[in-house]
Amino acid sequence: MGTRATTICSLFFLLWVLAEPAENSDFYLPGDYLLGGLFSLHANMKGIVHLNFLQVPMCKEYEVKVIGYNLMQAMRFAVEEINNDSSLLPGVLLGYEIVDVCYISNNVQPVLYFLAHEDNLLPIQEDYSNYISRVVAVIGPDNSESVMTVANFLSLFLLPQITYSAISDELQDKVRFPALLRTTPSADHHVEAMVQLMLHFRWNWIIVLVSSDTYGRDNGQLLGERLARRDICIAFQETLPTLQPNQNMTSEERQRLVTIVDKLQQSTARVVVVFSPDLSLYDFFNEVLRQNFTGAVWIASESWAIDPVLHNLTELRHLGTFLGITIQSVPIPGFSEFREWSPQAGPPPLSRTSQSYTCNQECDNCLNATLSFNTILRLSGERVVYSVYSAVYAVAHALHSLLGCDNSTCTKRVVYPWQLLEEIWKVNFTLLDHQIFFDPQGDVALHLEIVQWQWDRSQNPFQSVASYYPLQRQLKHIQDISWHTINNTIPVSMCSKRCQSGQKKKPVGIHVCCFECIDCLPGTFLNHTEDEYECQACPNNEWSYQSETSCFKRQLVFLEWHEAPTIAVALLAALGFLSTLAILVIFWRHFQTPIVRSAGGPMCFLMLTLLLVAYMVVPVYVGPPKVSTCLCRQALFPLCFTICISCIAVRSFQIVCAFKMASRFPRAYSYWVRYQGPYVSMAFITVLKMVIVVIGMLATGLSPTTRTDPDDPKITIVSCNPNYRNSLLFNTSLDLLLSVVGFSFAYMGKELPTNYNEAKFITLSMTFYFTSSVSLCTFMSAYSGVLVTIVDLLVTVLNLLAISLGYFGPKCYMILFYPERNTPAYFNSMIQGYTMRRD
């Protein structure tokens, strides 16, 4: 036999064993089409699927489950309301057969009973397309584990099953459960609502408690995965112990509860999420009360979010704030009154004692127990009740379509389960202002609500404080919550406080929520969107202060005209330019005089012209550097200055040669004069300087560069030569050598005739240049920044002034104030006197 035949044989055997005469029950309403109902009217403390036992458990031996009876009444109310409606199923009587599954203890026997014929036989067939079961659809049961058990049977027959509160995401697998639908959002939405609640209140340090069954494990795992994506950490997760049926808690289980509550006390987390059936929580909360663990926020899963019996433990109000995730409340007119006057479940009528029936269809204490909670049930509103109510109406609308009903009649005919299933998938109707239809996963998109537990008898015990919409996956309409804290402040549940702006996180331990906050150093910033654990360096042209989230442009610093040092240097340069120009005019007017000729004659005009050009180069030091200004700084000015110094050095050498070396080396002196020695020397020096300048420009380039001021990193110094310090000695080496040579020859000519003795003036100029250059190098080794540029420019101008005024100034003074000394006769007399002294 195939797998299908083997499965059917197993079902037949189980049905033969379990279908014995059962206890009396009247959870039955005859009709043309019967609905099966599976509800937990009783519950044990730890459900066991009794596949290994030959005897069906007696549910009445367990405690009454008020919510289960309330949901059963919702099914009965919906069926009676439909039967009284002349338009939905006119002429058709809808009936029901309800069985108590006592949570997860009794699922197999009822489903076999629903699948069997009236004679309690389930025949083995190759094709069940034309098979007629006892019921056309099943409503329930209430939890995911039971739903899977039932669905595995019903799916073989494609008998429609609509669950009203099972949320497991596994139930969306339509390959495994093709006949299963539900009128409640999936666990994915329940967990998402919890996570968005935590995000809204910035709780990222959470405790998770789960039950030891499939419900707790699966939802705890789903929550953990979802929290990890949102950087919410689980401080610890524990499994709550539960009791065996009709057994007291063992010492090991009690010690386990004590240990869990001890961990709650020691943890810094103050938000506790509990995924567990209500049955597992009574002993747990009693232990919490005993240890007086207070100040926490308890987030309840839908299994106990609106449980009236657990809410009846009024001492829970002292433990903290209780929030729950549950389905929306939809008022059902007339239901509260129906629940209150429903007759007590009694023995079955005599007309049915000869027919087939099943066990677990009685609940002697259900009505009394429910009435004792009637106030809280009435104030809390119809939540899961509406899910049952809409499930029954979904079947009724499918029958309406399948039977071809109009406003007055329906065509009664045989309804096969697979036919009804197809129509249920198609239903789309409005029920109490809510649209009911099934999405591709078989779910109805009713929105969820966040409820807060209240113990004020005048208020709703489960007050809605927010709504979650599955289609938008958004938490909205968040209202004020009454926190059990001082001044009603929002509780804080964070492993580490949020870092301030511009602080990076340094992980502490294994949890991403536990960290130290460290300020980002200057020059770095924190980009929260990319990396919260590392500060990023600012770009080269930007800077930041400590603890910044962005960088700002560095201030570009260069010499500007409005600055006082620049103005002072510019005035000196203007003074030098004007004085040099005046000297040039004076020398031009007295070109043929002995003083001008002794100073060098045409060579003086070359020097003065180059000095004027050098003064005109001074303005290029001011303002942002460009390629053209850098060319002037690095090429034009050094050439001008070097030629001036070379003229002085050559002139000093020429005078010494004329008076001291001509007689000793007449031949050499004649070559010097004949082949224009001074000009050849100056040309050689000029070419050598040009080579030095070109090498320097090739090494450093002409493009302006930027560098950070080491004393003030927010400042960027714009300069022409990035390696100015290193190249300064190389660029000035020739000038320093010429100054030493000029000084030496001037010193050698200190005994020459007064009119030719320029030792004092050349010594002044050359000594000043040498000293200033050495001082500039020393200054640059100690300081940096734009101050170096200012000092460099100042030294340059002073060196030019030293030549203009120190070398040419005394000669102008003699020309203007002692004209009698500017005659050939005077010069000849001075030469004769020098000659006589030597003799």
UniProtKB/Swiss-Prot annotation:
It comes from the Eukaryota. Pfam families: 7tm_3, ANF_receptor, NCD3G. It is a multi-pass membrane protein. One of its GO terms (molecular function) is G protein-coupled receptor activity. Glycans are attached at N84, N248, N292, N312, N368, N407, N428, N487, N527. CDD domains: 7tmC_TAS1R2, PBP1_taste_receptor. The chain crosses the membrane at residues 567-587, 603-623, 636-656, 682-702, 728-748, 761-781, 785-805. InterPro entries: ANF_lig-bd_rcpt (IPR001828), GPCR_3 (IPR000337), GPCR_3_9-Cys_dom (IPR011500), GPCR_3_9-Cys_sf (IPR038550), GPCR_3_C (IPR017978), GPCR_3_Ca_sens_rcpt-rel (IPR000068), GPCR_3_CS (IPR017979), Peripla_BP_I (IPR028082). One of its GO terms (biological process) is sensory perception of taste. It is found in: Cell membrane. PROSITE patterns: G_PROTEIN_RECEP_F3_2, G_PROTEIN_RECEP_F3_4. Belongs to the G-protein coupled receptor 3 family. TAS1R subfamily. Forms heterodimers with TAS1R3. This is Taste receptor type 1 member 2.
